UniProtKB/Swiss-Prot annotation:
Name used for this protein in its record: Conotoxin Cal9.2f
Function: Probable neurotoxin with unknown target. Possibly targets ion channels.
Record key words, sorted: Disulfide bond, Ion channel impairing toxin, Neurotoxin, Secreted, Toxin
Cell compartments where the protein resides: Secreted
Chain residues in the propeptide: 1-6
Length: 53
């Protein structure tokens, strides 16, 4: 994407600052986890931080 800031993106980060977004394997909606939580149930075993969103 060119010239698009994070804030103008079509997908707003769904979690509070300091949390990360996990897409559960059995769900289509993100849940918010603390960065220290297990990501075993998340797609690709990852929890996406606001910086990485």
């Amino acid at each position: 994407k060119k010239g698009v800031t994070l804030r103008e993106d079509d997908r707003t980060f769904p979690c509070s600052s300091g949390l990360c977004a996990c897409l559960p394997l059995d769900s289509y909606s993100y849940i918010c986890l603390s960065p220290s939580s297990s990501t075993a149930n998340c797609e690709n075993d990852e929890c996406i931080s606001e910086d990485d969103w």
